[in-house]
Curated annotation (Swiss-Prot):
Lineage start: Eukaryota, Metazoa, Chordata, Craniata, Vertebrata
UniProt modified residues of type Phosphothreonine: T927, T1270, T1465
Pfam families on file: DUF3384, Rap_GAP, Tuberin
The protein's role, per its UniProt record: Catalytic component of the TSC-TBC complex, a multiprotein complex that acts as a negative regulator of the canonical mTORC1 complex, an evolutionarily conserved central nutrient sensor that stimulates anabolic reactions and macromolecule biosynthesis to promote cellular biomass generation and growth. Within the TSC-TBC complex, TSC2 acts as a GTPase-activating protein (GAP) for the small GTPase RHEB, a direct activator of the protein kinase activity of mTORC1.
Gene3D superfamilies: Rap/Ran-GAP (3.40.50.11210)
Tissue occurrence: Widely expressed.
Single GO BP term: excitatory chemical synaptic transmission
The protein, known as: Tuberin
Keyword Ubl conjugation: yes
InterPro entries, sorted: ARM-type_fold, Rap/Ran-GAP_sf, Rap/Ran_GAP_dom, Tuberin, Tuberin-type_domain, Tuberin/Ral-act_asu, Tuberin_N
Organism annotation: Mus musculus (Mouse)
Annotated membrane topology: Peripheral membrane protein
Location of region: Disordered: 1078-1174, 1325-1356, 1428-1490, 1772-1798
UniProt entry keywords in alphabetical sequence: Cytoplasm, GTPase activation, Lysosome, Membrane, Phosphoprotein, Tumor suppressor, Ubl conjugation
Ranges annotated as biased composition (Low complexity): 1078-1097, 1448-1463
């Protein structure tokens, strides 16, 4: 509209030019400067005139055209030219002539236009008045040139509009329209009168033409009219119709919309909208779809389009009705455009739409949906439903302001056409009205279920309806459960099993499960019926199904899995709710379904998954003693049901056991008494599940399922109530398990196995179940028991060998009758197992367990014993195995050697020696001379002598041991496969790793090196003690703790004592001087002894000792006077243990009590006789004359070794020299008569003399020195009751025989064994003295009758029978003993030895003769550096083996190890060699004769020299060393404080009900349950503390005066003692609020036993004990007299050492005392050892030693001290070190070897078989 203004300005310029007021418009053609005028000559004119021909004229016109375009013509030349050619325009002229003239006019106008003036009007007139309508194009070209394409109309203004209108009628072309556009733009004011006609004609052209170019140009004209002129109102309808139609042309959409937008922007905008609405509503246009579509488009775009006109104020509400009317006649195009338009409206202006607008929109949408029923247009259908979706999204966003009900009615009406999401929203909307506040809500729910569930095929919609139903049930089921289940659930979901959609079936089943879980009415059965129908579907794949479709088919069976898992959940809930019949039915349904699996052989993965989860749940069922069923919660706590039982009360619980079974099942706990009607109780017989489990074991093909069942069965079998209260056949279970292992096709039927699956994996899974079944052995047939053992034996060749060994160890305890037959073969099979770290602990602990079960191996022959040593010896290799394994191996070797039958032991010594050399010693050999020791094997390839020699002919009393050969060559070959040697490269490569494998903490390099060296020394010391142990026990079973007999006390009291250090032994010789005789006679011993007889007051001594291992056991022992009583606390490890005279420099007191230290002296302190108890003077005078006759020539030899002490009491029978003035020794018989006479005299005189000489003194206090004279102690003294028989025998203390309790009439023993008397006195036990009827005598070779008799002895000790031999033709007397009732565990204990223990030593025999003057003394090389000696007497002569030290000459024959054994006789033969000797004259003459030497009697040196002297001892280290002073005697006393047996202390605590987390309550318990009491009884023997002597019974620090209670339990075997710190037996003091008195004992024990009777889990850390408590052994009582053993270890504890006990899970053992004692004590022994090894790692420089090692180290330290003392006293003597036997090259610049290195080399090179010279 701004263009007319510019035109007005143009007119003003023109007027100015006309008036001369302005400048004319510059002619662009003159821009280049003034052109040269062209002159039209006459000739040119003549050529143009008619005179010339037409062709010449046309030619000349063409030339003039060129000139006119480019040059300026002279003035009036144009007129002349026009006049010359004007005649050619006549109509009759040819077209060429006319065209040439029009072309000339065009050229003149273009070239001379600015000079034409009025000629322009002339030329325009020529064109306008052209005679014909021809030549339109040329005329238009002249017009375009004349007006400059419509821009300049000077001199043409008046007639221009008429000419344009006239031209439009004749030639309305696009070219003209383009000129017209400029005319309208630049000269619109001259066209006003005719504009309406022009618009009309152009609109008609647009409507009629088909040329898009014409339409486009016409639109340009119309646009120019709208923009530069005013469109007439009368032209508006036609204009709009034209545009509405034109908009349908795709190419013209943009210009049409632009034109309409321009129109709507004018004052005619609202009129245009109105006209378009009228068009949409006009019925005459209902069929004109393009027109309606254009109108809809323009209205929508103008009002709410992307480029809407904000000047238009029409609201959507005003135009949408027109849209609705436009849809009166269904038309796809119009409807499509309407949908687009209102979609655009809704999306852009949704927030501004009012409710009335939404109503109209919903009307339009409804009509659209109706039209879709008739219009087959997918595009329209899609866009309409997209519109609905858009509205739906607004509803979701709360931006829909219309009627939601109206909208969802539309959606529901066309639900089948709506997408799932829309229906889901619809269902959600409908669900809002389903609640009790709405009338008819149940009917609405029914309609919803019927409409969208029963008749809906889309899963999502049906699932949504199920969600609505589930939500309704969840919210209001408690009020309307009855109506909902009746009216909706059952009616609508009963078809679920037949539904084709597996997802719907699955969710519907889950809904039924959820509903049934909380349903407690009769409707539960209806719901369960539907669930069972779902479960009844077959899980077998169709036969034609391909493998790739199995996954799809399995997915279609998910509803079955849901049903089964749902039943598991229902059962878990129903188990604890009423009615209990629901749980019973669910349980039966589950079992029935699983049975179908095995009946039809379902093998699909989903079927396996169902079985997997079903078994996973069902195997969690538990039962308590009241037969109530329960399940563990997520924390593992089992909650038992008050309504569901595992059996019926009327069920006969004993009916399960068949007649062929060994036992009937135990009665078990009492049945629960029903608290209500029987209908309230449900019965879930476990036998149903048990039968399914058997089917699983026999038929299951999926390995995951089978593995789960096998892993869960051991824990289920723990609850015996489940098994015994219903007919569950454990025989069948055992048979099924054994069949799995033996059947070759078991692996073939398994699938889903991991890669590399083999029979080993099957064994690994089955063996734990077999282990758990061991506790059911009383209910298994013997055949099944044998099958189990056989399967376990077969598993030894697989990776499960360790588990099998564990199980076999339990079988040994639980099933001795079965294992005893298989044991010989089993032991041989164990030798086939390679010695690996993984098998070390199981094998060694199995052997350790077996060693404590002598009744199992009482029939062992040498082959079996050799197998045991072949198994154990490789594990002594420190380069391969850790410290615990090595220590345990030495422990096993020692136990088995001691338990081995006596005749076999000698043959095993070289075998064990070579094994130790190969496995231990060579590991530390760093010398180049190793060729002699590179023995490939010390296994049974080089078997013991007893296995190599031929079997000797059987004789009655043969001295040769009964040795057997292998009966089969295959057995011999089996032994050859085991090698216990280590090759040189293995040693070199692994020694360093092994030595440093123990965790030494954060120590520096020096401490690490020290720890490594200590570890090396430890292994060498273990070897030394092992060899020393063999030397001690190879020919005898005497205990390691001798006790001086009353005769010895009498003879040796106040005697002279000297001690020599010989190798690693201390030899103490004590000779008699007559003090005992004078004391007997009432004489004053001070006459002979002077001041040396003084005895120190024990109360003045306070001693605190530390023994090895110097750990927790080191406690301060003090004697504190408290009023009238003395409180004595036992020292750890038996500090009060006295072996020999503690201070040998002080003679004995008359009462036989020397100064023994505070504790032992108090215990042995004799009562002082009353003052009036004096002998008559006459008798004293008469008997005094015979004092020298009674005591001369007696001597005691006490040998202290690392493994124990040995004592002999001997008499010198050499007559005195005729030149001597001394009187000969009194014969023993006369001495006995004198003693008996003195005894009778004292009885008549009523004098309580305190010297014990009567063998019947049962009430006498035990003697002070606990020595047992093992060879020649005359303890069986003559009494009148002995019928005058006198014999010489072994000490009663060491004859391991006791009276049999319960048969007092069979035998009577005249003399109580002193050691037994001492032990019984220490324990405070009552004894029965019985008299034997007969005496027996036998040689070392036992007869068959004796064998059979000894094999009947009670288990618990090594059967030993000691033969008694007399001189010459002395009549033989038989001494027989009857077996006894077992009282305790083991036979030959160092201190704690019971009657049964002593009895057990009857098995093997050895002849011991008295020492005669003709005794031959032979000496050979020793065991350990020539320092070990074995004393034995065979036949009728006594041989004393003395091992001197030092190297041998090269001329001697060499031993197998490259060194020649030394052998020479001291008394009869010349020395075999001469060796270098270091003179020590200064030392020998260090002192003059002392006062002790003036004491009458034989000098101890005389006795020592007769036994040990040799002219050639070799080097200095082999020479005996006399202890120089009293300080060293004190060291000997300290050695006596170290017991020769290992000691352990173990805590025992009782946890009652509700005490599992209360430390104070646990410690405050003063008693426990009856089962707890039975358990304590099985731990060991009850002892009374006040009657115990701490030096004889290890108490672990318990006070004997009542501070720590009155009683406790103790246990022992051959080489160890254990005491139990029992919290309930300790006093609970009110003043001790925190129970510190108890914790000071319990907190310092490595291992604690927790008897957990609380019914809850006991957690480690509940008892806040000290840092030393590593392991808890938790005993949980189970039903049917069974206990559960579990281990709890600290994170830093020795769990790894004892882990094999936990491999099968947990151990279930019978609560029988014998079984519990064996199981628990063996386990505790191993745990203690592992704990001690672990604890030593906290101090790497203090490696754990046994008591034997501690004694060995003490002796070695004593040797070093003596050498240092000698060197200090005699500086001229060199400091002696034991030299190495191997000579290093002289040129090698090596450092001087240390003492340890030299000792190590000497030990390696000198370990020989001492049995070669014995």
């Amino acid at each position: 509209m701004a263009k007319p203004t510019s035109k007005d300005s143009g007119l003003k310029e023109k007027f100015k030019i006309l008036l001369g007021l302005g400048t004319s418009r510059p002619n662009p053609r003159c821009a280049e400067g003034k052109q040269t005028e062209f002159i039209i000559t006459s000739e040119i004119l003549r050529e143009l005139s008619g005179e010339c021909g037409l062709n010449n004229r046309i030619r000349m016109i063409g030339q003039i055209c060129d000139v006119a375009k480019t040059k300026k013509l002279e003035e009036h030349a144009v007129e002349a030219l026009w006049k010359a050619v004007s005649d050619l325009l006549q109509p009759e002229r040819p077209p060429e002539a006319r065209h040439a003239v029009l072309t000339l006019l065009k050229a003149i106008v273009q070239g001379q236009g600015d000079r034409l003036g009025v000629l322009r009007a002339l030329f325009f007139k020529v064109i306008k008045d052209y005679p014909s309508n021809e030549d339109l194009h040329e005329r238009l070209e002249v017009f375009k040139a004349l007006t400059d394409n419509g821009r300049h109309i000077t001199y043409l203004e008046e007639e221009l509009a008429e000419f344009v209108l006239q031209w439009m009628d004749v030639g309305l072309s696009s070219e003209f329209l383009l000129v017209l556009v400029n005319l309208v733009k630049f000269n619109s004011c001259y066209l006003d009168e005719y504009i309406a006609s022009m618009v009309h004609m152009i609109c008609l052209l647009c409507i009629r033409t088909v040329s898009s170019v014409d339409i486009e140009v016409s639109l340009q004209v119309l646009d120019a009219v709208v923009c530069y002129n005013c469109l007439p109102a009368e032209s508006l309808p036609l204009f709009i119709i034209t545009l509405c139609r034109t908009i349908n042309v795709k190419e013209l959409c943009e210009p049409c919309w632009k034109l309409m937008r321009n129109l709507l922007g004018t004052h005619l905008g609202h009129s245009a909208i109105y006209n378009m609405c009228r068009i949409m509503e006009d019925r005459s246009y209902m069929e004109d779809a393009p027109l309606l579509r254009g109108a809809v488009f323009f209205v929508g775009m103008a009002l709410w389009g992307a480029h809407r006109l904000y000047s238009l104020k029409n609201s959507p509400t005003s135009v949408l009705p027109s849209f609705y009317e436009a849809m009166t006649c269904p038309n796809e195009v119009v409807s499509y455009e309407i949908v687009l338009s209102i979609t655009r409206l809704i999306k852009k202006y949704r927030k501004e739409l009012q409710a009335v607008t939404w109503d109209i929109l919903l009307d339009i949408i409804e009509r659209l949906l109706q039209q879709l029923q008739n219009l087959d247009s997918p595009e329209l259908k899609t866009i309409v439903h997209d519109l609905l979706t858009t509205v739906e999204e607004l509803c979701d966003q709360n931006e829909f302001h219309g009627s939601q009900e109206r909208y969802y009615e539309l959606v529901e009406s066309y639900a089948d056409q709506r997408p799932e999401s829309s229906l889901l929203n619809l269902i959600s909307y409908r669900a809002q009205s389903i609640h009790p506040a709405k009338d008819g809500w149940i009917q609405n729910l029914q309609l919803l279920m019927e409409r969208f569930f029963r008749n809906e095929c889309r899963s999502a919609v049906a699932i949504k309806v199920l969600d609505v139903l589930s939500f309704v049930l969840l919210i209001i089921r408690q009020f309307y459960e009855e109506e909902l289940i009746n009216s909706v659930v059952i009616s609508q979901l009963s078809h679920i099993p037949e539904d084709k959609d597996h997802q719907v079936r699955k969710l519907a089943t889950q809904l039924l499960v959820d509903l049934a879980e909380g349903c407690h009415t009769h409707h539960f059965n209806s719901l369960l019926d539907i669930i069972e129908k779902v479960m009844a579907r077959s899980l077998s794949p169709p036969p034609e199904l391909e493998e790739r479709d199995l996954a799809v088919h399995s997915a279609s069976l998910e509803d079955v899995k849901t049903a089964v898992l749902g039943l598991l959940v229902i059962l878990q809930t129903k188990l604890y709710t009423l009615p209990a019949s629901h749980a019973t039915r669910v349980y039966e349904s589950l079992i029935s379904h699983i049975q179908l699996h095995y009946k039809h052989g379902y093998s699909l993965p989903i079927a396996s998954s169902i079985r997997l989860q079903a078994f996973d749940f069902l195997l969690l069922l538990r039962a308590d003693s009241l037969h109530r069923l329960g399940l563990p919660n997520k924390d593992g706590v089992v909650r038992f049901s008050p309504y569901c039982l595992c059996d019926c009360m009327e069920l006969d619980r004993a009916s399960e056991k068949k007649a062929s079974g060994p036992l009937s099942p135990p009665t078990g706990p009492p049945s629960p008494v029903p608290m209500g009607p029987a209908v309230r109780l449900g019965y879930l017989p476990y036998s149903l599940l048990f039968r399914v489990l058997l089917q699983c074991l026999k038929q299951e093909s999926d390995w995951k399922v089978l593995k789960l069942v096998l892993s869960r069965l051991p824990e289920s079998l723990r609850y015996k109530v489940l098994i015994f209260t219903s007919p569950c056949s454990v025989d069948q279970l055992s048979s099924a398990l054994c069949s799995m292992l033996s059947a070759p096709k078991t692996l073939e039927r398994l699938r889903g196995t991991p890669e590399g699956f083999s029979r080993t994996d099957l064994h690994l899974a089955v063996v734990p179940v077999l282990t758990a079944l061991i506790s059911y052995h009383n209910y298994l047939d013997k055949t099944r028991q044998r099958e189990m053992v056989y399967c376990l034996e077969q598993g030894l060749i697989y990776r499960c060998a360790s588990q099998c060994v564990v199980a076999l160890a339990i079988c040994s305890v639980e099933m001795p009758d079965i294992i005893i037959k298989a044991l010989p073969v089993l032991v041989v099979k164990l030798t086939h197992i390679s010695a690996t770290a993984s098998m070390a602990i199981p094998l060694l602990e199995f052997l350790s367990t077996l060693a404590r079960l002598p009744h199992l191996y009482r029939n062992f022959v040498p082959e079996q014993y050799a197998s045991v040593f072949a198994i154990s010896l490789p594990y002594t290799n420190p380069s391969k195995f850790n410290q615990y394994i090595v220590c345990l191996a030495h422990h096993v070797i020692a136990m088995w050697f001691i338990r081995c039958r006596l005749p076999f032991r000698k043959d095993f010594v070289p075998y064990i020696t070579k094994g130790l050399r190969s496995n231990v010693l060579l590991s530390f050999d760093d010398t180049p001379e190793k060729d002699s020791f590179r023995a490939r094997s010390t296994s049974l390839n080089e078997r013991p002598k007893s296995l190599r020699i031929a079997r000797a002919p059987k004789q009655g009393l043969n001295n040769s041991p009964p040795v057997k050969e292998f009966k089969e060559s295959c057995a011999a070959e089996a032994f050859r496969c085991r090698s216990i040697s280590v090759s040189e490269h293995v040693v070199r490569s692994r020694i360093q790793t092994s030595l440093t494998s123990a965790s030494l903490g954060s120590a520096d390099e020096n401490s690490m090196a020290q720890a490594d060296d200590n570890l090396k020394n430890l292994h060498l010391e273990l070897t030394e003690t092992c060899l020393d142990m063999m030397a001690r026990y190879v020919f005898s079973n005497f205990t390691a703790v001798p006790k001086r007999s009353p005769v010895g006390e009498f003879l040796l009291a106040g005697g002279r004592t000297k001690t020599w250090l010989v190798g690693n032994k201390l030899v103490t010789v004590t000779t008699s001087v007559g003090t005992g005789t004078r004391s007997l006679l009432g004489l004053d011993s001070g006459d002979l002894q002077g001041g040396s007889d003084s005895s120190s007051d024990p109360s003045t001594h306070v001693r605190q000792t530390k023994e090895a291992p110097a750990k927790l056991e080191s406690q301060a022992g003090q004697q504190v006077s408290r009023g009238a009583r003395d409180r004595v606390r036992s020292m750890s490890g038996g500090h009060g243990l006295r072996v020999g005279v503690l201070d040998t420099s002080a003679p004995y007191s008359p009462g036989g009590s020397a100064s023994l230290g505070p504790q032992t002296a108090v215990a042995a302190k004799p009562e002082k006789p009353p003052a009036g108890a004096q002998l008559p003077t006459a008798e004293k005078t008469n008997l005094a004359a015979y004092v020298p006759l009674l005591t001369q020539g007696w001597a005691e030899i006490l040998v202290r070794r690392p493994t124990g002490n040995t004592s002999w009491l001997m008499s010198l029978e050499n007559p005195l020299s005729p030149f001597s003035s001394d009187i000969n020794n009194m014969p023993l018989q006369e001495l006995s008569n004198a003693l008996m006479a003195a005894e009778r005299f004292k009885e008549h005189g009523h004098a309580p003399v305190q010297v014990i000489v009567s063998a019947t003194g049962c009430t006498a206090k035990p003697p002070t020195l606990p020595r047992s004279n093992t060879v020649a102690s005359f303890s069986s003294l003559y009494q009148p009751s002995c019928q005058g028989q006198l014999h010489r025998s072994v000490s009663w203390a060491d004859s391991a025989m006791v009276l049999e309790e319960g048969s007092p009439g069979e035998t009577q023993v005249p003399v109580e064994p002193p050691e037994l008397e001492d032990f019984e006195a220490a324990l405070g036990t009552d004894r029965h003295c019985q008299r034997p009827d007969t005496y027996s005598r036998s040689s070392s070779a036992s007869s068959q009758e004796e064998k059979s008799h000894l094999e009947e002895l009670a288990a618990g000790g090594i059967p030993i029978e000691r033969a008694i031999s007399s001189e010459g033709a002395r009549p033989a007397v038989d001494l027989s003993f009857q077996p006894s009732q077992p009282l305790s565990k083991s036979s030959s204990s160092p201190e704690l030895q019971t009657l049964q223990d002593i009895l057990g030593d009857l098995g093997d025999k050895i002849d011991i003769g008295r020492l005669s003057p003709e005794a031959k003394v032979r000496s050979q090389s020793g065991i350990l550096d020539g320092e070990a000696a074995t004393w034995s007497a065979t036949g009728e002569e006594s041989r004393i083996t003395v091992p001197p030290e030092g190297p041998l000459p090269s001329s001697s024959p060499r031993s197998p190890s490259g060194l020649r054994p030394r052998g020479y006789t001291i008394s009869d033969s010349a020395p075999s060699r001469r060796g270098k000797r270091v003179e020590r004259d200064n030392f020998k003459s260090r002192a003059a004769a002392s006062s002790a030497e003036k004491v009458p009697g034989i000098n101890p040196s005389f006795v020592f020299l007769q036994l040990y002297h040799s002219p050639f001892f070799g080097d200095e280290s082999n020479k005996p060393i006399l202890l120089p002073n009293e300080s060293f005697e004190r060291s000997v006393q300290l050695l006596d404080q170290i017991p020769s047996y290992d000691t352990h202390k173990i805590a025992v605590l009782y946890v009652g009900e509700g005490q599992s987390s209360s430390e104070l309550a646990i410690l405050s318990n003063e008693h426990g349950s009856y089962r707890y009491t039975e358990f304590l009884t099985g731990l060991g023997r009850l002892i009374e503390l006040k009657d115990c002597q701490p030096d004889k019974v290890y108490l672990g620090g318990l006070d004997v005066c009542g501070e720590d209670g009155q009683f406790t339990y103790c246990w022992h075997d051959d080489i160890m003692q254990a005491v139990f710190h029992i919290a309930t037996l300790m006093p609970t003091k009110d003043v001790d609020k925190h129970r510190c008195d108890k914790k000071r004992h319990l907190g310092n024990d490595f291992v604690s036993i927790i008897y957990n009777d609380s019914g809850e889990d006991f957690k480690l850390g509940t008892i806040k004990q000290g840092q030393f408590n590593f392991v808890h052994v938790i005993i949980t009582p189970l039903d049917y007299k069974c206990n559960l053993l579990t281990l709890q270890c600290r994170k830093d504890g020795p769990a790894c050492k004892c882990e094999w006990w936990r491999q099968p899970g947990e151990i279930v053992v019978w609560a029988l005392p014998v079984v519990m004692e064996l199981t628990v004590t063996i386990l505790l022994c191993h745990l203690q050892m592992a704990s001690q090894v672990h604890h030593s790692r906290s101090n790497p420089t203090d490696i754990y030693p046994s008591k034997w090692i501690a004694r060995l180290r003490h002796i070695k330290r004593l040797r070093q001290r003596i050498r240092e003392e000698v060197h200090y006293s005699n500086p001229s003597l060199p400091l002696m070190h034991p030299p190495a036997h191997t000579k290093a090259p002289a040129q090698a610049p090596e450092a001087t070897p240390t003492y340890e290195t030299g000792q190590r080399k000497r030990l390696i090179s000198s370990v020989d078989d001492f049995t070669e010279f014995v």
